[in-house]
Amino acid sequence: MSDIDQRLREDVHLLGELLGETIRQQHGEAFLQKIEDIRHSAKADRRGEGEQLSSTLGDLAEEDLLPVARAFNQFLNLANIAEQYQLIHRRDTDQPEPFEARVLPELLARLKAAGHGNDALARQLARLDIQLVLTAHPTEVARRTLIQKYDAIAAQLAAQDHRDLIPAERQQVRERLRRLIAEAWHTEEIRRTRPTPVDEAKWGFAVIEHSLWQAVPNHLRKVDKALFEATGLRLPLESAPVRFASWMGGDRDGNPNVTAAVTREVLLLARWMAADLFLRDIDYLAAELSMQQASGALREQVGDSAEPYRALLKQLRDRLRATRAWAHASLAGPQPASAAVLVDNRDLIAPLELCYQSLHACGMGVIADGPLLDSLRRAVTFGLFLVRLDVRQDAARHRDALSEITDYLGLGRYADWDEERRIEFLQHELKNRRPLLPAHFKPAAETAEVLATCREIAAAPAASLGSYVISMAGAASDVLAVQLLLKEAGLTRPMRVVPLFETLADLDNAGPVMERLLGLPGYRAGLHGPQEVMIGYSDSAKDAGTTAAAWAQYRAQENLVRICREHQVELLLFHGRGGTVGRGGGPAHAAILSQPPGSVGGRFRTTEQGEMIRFKFGLPGIAEQNLNLYLAAVLEATLLPPPPPEPAWRALMDQLAADGVKAYRGVVRDNPEFVEYFRQSTPEQELGRLPLGSRPAKRRAGGIESLRAIPWIFGWTQTRLMLPAWLGWETALSNALARGQADLLAQMREQWPFFRTRIDMLEMVLAKADAQIAEAYDQRLVQPRLLPLGAHLRDLLSQSCQVVLGLTGQQVLLAHSPETLEFIRLRNTYLDPLHRLQAELLARSRSREAALDSPLEQALLVTVAGIAAGLRNTG
């Protein structure tokens, strides 16, 4: 065992011991002993030395269910804190820096060696356009209150690592840890009520306030340092390689709770939050910048003030206060904005820039490059609107709205027209100067909501909004329809209208749709920037399995790159990835480097899912590491793109995809018992009842195809079968080996980043899958006639593991990554009891109707949250 593993185990042991003390104080020694017995039984079960755990949990009294679930949930959260702390800070002086810290300096050296000049490198880095789009997520059940306590626990782990602590100081740290853990234990960790979209948006703002606000300027300092050491050039002040957008409060696809009024409220809350955060910065800077010497340009603004910097910052502070007050008042109803209210980001940036330039001009660069520079970087990155809010709606809602309008106008039903007639009508109306809608038109509620959303977009400042994303887009008319609805609402500025291609068929059709759109007269002239296209990962994987979906996504991107190049239009690909492999998730750095050549081009946009936001961006140090990885990967994919795949690789990938989709659909669609087995063996039915997010877990009606991708993945993840992430690969790879293509598979894995990344992610998810746990759910929950199907699926899981081991030449999955393996093993100690307890709770819940606020249902929700926390990339 390495020293780093030992220290992690020591931290986990300490935190667990302190939690045990807290539990003993509330529930007594006998209850704590029961927890210990369950933990030891879980270890024995995993070693195959006994099967006591299920019977122990089955004997639990009703009143013990919730505290037992809470105990193991808290153990897992504390283990996660220790692990995250280790990933950021733990390194002996003789050990190399972690990869995340080295990745950019090493890349810049490689780029220079490959012939890229200093000026070109600096120019490309400064021009990078990386947009991370924060999305709400039903499985992110951790409350903001607890997240803040967990951050404080991480800070105390850092404090106890100081080597010069005297015993009394070390004891103080331990007492603070004990108090924080007690506070966390006595705080209810789950919501009793479903969060609203506004709650979700506030959660996203809290991540910015508590982590990204600090992480972004720290990250940019390191980027600037790496660039200067490599090229002698600095990162320009106006450069913001990574910016943030959000779907929280803008994503109304399938969520009737996200209304035009909600979107307006979230936009105002973002402005309030931005003003409040910058006020804190300005208060600090005004206290610091007491200097008297100033440049002529600054003096022109403030006259002969004895404290010119403070005088200028006071003007900005007054305007920020006015902005905050206006945003707060506007939440109650529309308010006129005075001239003092800040609307243009330049009005925020310019005073800070003037102070910065003046300090440098007066020989005080060391002061300029301190907290002032950090505030300036924040102003450029976050601005007055904090994040750009995307709007997302289903294409069918726009078609229905236009059908009602054309029907009212006596033109027939838009939905009944063919594509050519739709395009002809839309193009004519887009050029028409008269309104399409008469003033007295009274639409039905759903159409009225679509039109109200468009009016909110037209009324909002351009810099507060990102893209209008059309889910389930399938034709060029879907894009023009939104453009027309926005025009009718009074939008006169350009806004990116983005088709989202999601299913396997839609991905295959993405090229022809964009070819048609870009070929329409006048369309390209109205772009005002790159053509953005969104690639959906979740629904395509649910539709066809990850083997076929991954290849369809790759081919769709290749086609889009080619078509945009032919039309001389720049392309921005927006990747709709989930947190899990089954929804396109996985390590971002490897995923970006595995994109088709030419598909990145200095621009990259991706969703960051709720439960992964906390793990990737919840602590400033972790956030910095992930920002480094994104920036380095996009720069490398832009300047050192991978070569196109060899014809033989493409041919084999075609075959793998065909075999994979056939095997996947053979189980998921063609087996008449599959849906019933899924509903019995996983908590899928219960997930819809639990208060896990503002969006319903199901679309309106139907079977598996009606399920949203998140509960589909989430149900399988909770039982550790992880089926959506691997089903289909076992057959596809086995068939290739049977055809004698082992050498070709090895070559693809060695030389083709796309294929290597797929296999690496498959291996990672197989290492987290657990047939023993999945079987325990079956034994407790599934009717005897369906048990053979469960056994068959576990056989397929075993086959997947064996074929991946054969492909990688290892004896154990993840043998090449012992640290990851250690993290998984460490968490299994606490996960195993939660899984077994969840199966017991599901069995009890299904045998009777339990109220949502009953201890049984509350305990079930805690197990869902705990397993999600333990497995990280959950749903």
UniProtKB/Swiss-Prot annotation:
GO annotation, biological process: carbon fixation; oxaloacetate metabolic process; tricarboxylic acid cycle
Protein keywords: Carbon dioxide fixation, Lyase, Magnesium
Domain of life per record: Bacteria
Catalysis: reaction(s): oxaloacetate + phosphate = phosphoenolpyruvate + hydrogencarbonate
EC number: 4.1.1.31
Cofactor(s) needed by this chain: Mg(2+)
Enzyme class of the recorded protein, top EC level: lyase
One GO cellular component, as annotated: cytosol
Any one GO molecular-function label of the UniProt entry: magnesium ion binding
Active site: 137, 542
Pfam family, one: PEPcase
Function: Forms oxaloacetate, a four-carbon dicarboxylic acid source for the tricarboxylic acid cycle.
Family the UniProt entry places it in: Belongs to the PEPCase type 1 family.
Name the UniProt record assigns to this protein: Phosphoenolpyruvate carboxylase
Native organism: Pseudomonas entomophila (strain L48)
Gene: ppc
